[in-house]
Curated annotation (Swiss-Prot):
Coarse class of the protein's main subcellular location: cytoplasm
GO molecular function, one term: molybdopterin-synthase adenylyltransferase activity
Protein's job: Plays a central role in 2-thiolation of mcm(5)S(2)U at tRNA wobble positions of cytosolic tRNA(Lys), tRNA(Glu) and tRNA(Gln). Also essential during biosynthesis of the molybdenum cofactor. Acts by mediating the C-terminal thiocarboxylation of sulfur carriers URM1 and MOCS2A. Its N-terminus first activates URM1 and MOCS2A as acyl-adenylates (-COAMP), then the persulfide sulfur on the catalytic cysteine is transferred to URM1 and MOCS2A to form thiocarboxylation (-COSH) of their C-terminus.
Protein name as it appears in the record: Adenylyltransferase and sulfurtransferase MOCS3-1
Species the sequence originates in: Zea mays (Maize)
Keyword line: ATP-binding, Cytoplasm, Metal-binding, Molybdenum cofactor biosynthesis, Multifunctional enzyme, Nucleotide-binding, Transferase, tRNA processing, Zinc
NCBIfam families reported in the protein's UniProt record: PRK05690.1 (NF004281)
Alphabetized CDD domains for the sequence: ThiF_MoeB_HesA_family
InterPro entries: MOCS3/Uba4, Rhodanese-like_dom, Rhodanese-like_dom_sf, ThiF/MoeB/HesA, ThiF_NAD_FAD-bd, Ubiquitin-activating_enz
Subcellular location: Cytoplasm
SUPFAM superfamilies referenced in this protein's UniProt entry, alphabetically: Activating enzymes of the ubiquitin-like proteins
Amino acid sequence: MGGRREAIERELKKLRAEREELDGRIRLLESQLEAGPAGFNGAAAGKGVGDDACGGSGACQSRVGNEFAPDGSLPADMIYRYSRHLLLPDFGVEGQRKLSQSSILVVGAGGLGSPLALYLAACGVGRLGIVDGDDVELNNLHRQIIHKEAYVGQSKVKSAADACREINSSIKVVEYHHTLKPCNALEVARKYDIVVDATDNLPTRYMISDCCVLLNKPLVSGAALGLEGQLTVYHHNGSPCYRCLFPTPPPVAACQRCSDSGVLGVVPGVIGCLQALEAIKVATGVGEPLCGRMLLFDALSARIRVVKLRGSSPDCTHCGENSVFTEEDFQKFDYESFTQSPMSDKAAPSVNVLPESARITCREYKKLADDGEPHLLLDVRPAHHFQIASISPSHNIPLSMLEEKLPALEASLKEAGEGSALVVLCRRGNDSQRAVQLLREKGFTSAKDIIGGLQAWGRDVDPDFPVY
């Protein structure tokens, strides 16, 4: 029964997504009819929307996009569509022409890539490439505004490309349904004028920067975490590459990701919009891009600061005067080993620092609790995590406060009864291992952690437990 229900739900999502796409195409044609003769050329151009052909490379490309009159002037439908751009003295016809003839690759269709891709499509970039190997998940939607509920479980790239085509059927949208890696990055990025990094992890940041240096492409790079964001343009007009600023990666403990630390939905939205702006400035030559400067955004105080960066380093191993880094070196380079981090925007990998004798599964703990064995369940997550969801009864002492709270823990353990077991858990089973290490060093020799933490509990014991 469960499998049949899941199949029906998947089919419903698929049909709803198809209906959304058809509704979008209907709205587009209706708006072009309302526009009168100025909109008819656009209607004719949009005839092939959705009739994509996929090649063996994993890229799907839509029909040909913006086309100009023989004398280079903008056609009537483009003048009507982009009239508010054309009225800007600093942008005008020449700016729109350059933008419509440019190609921009967006790496990542998540919180940053969502507004970024939507605005580039709406503003009329000639060819827009979108790279992402993930599927849409429900917990993406608070910040990844390009996706809809109907697309949950489907490819992010398909969802993003469909949304961009609904906004502007006159541009080319190229889909890459895979993660960008050293083995394919050069082939993909080589086809574009500008690359925009909208990813969320350290090894990919190094890889994209190295790729752009080898191909001599400008790189618009943004990041957002928690309530802060930042933005700069690398390897353009004398600006440094990522390695110029960070020749060695920071410690793993200093690298956070939104799946661990959280992010307020609007923050990547702000940075993604600014990334679109910087990409447009680079493509058109209008304004002063953030080359050699970094924009810092603080959402809580609503402050934006721009700080100066040092220039390109002549001693940089990758973009410096004597660099010998080649495309072959790039394709063989192990970015995950270099940064000690996974090439994924998802959760950090599990650690394994305890012997098997110091660990139990969540099912083993469930049996221990059901049998009424005396024990104390210690939850070492931060207090605000504990407020989200917890197993009852459990005591919350955050890992950061554990050592100073050992006397209180010892008293609680005595209250639980003589010979009580001390069982430790956290969100994913990493911090609980570190806690057990500390506890055993301090004399709590019977302490054990629950393998996989609350995520394993929700998966293997209680499917209704809220996983976050």
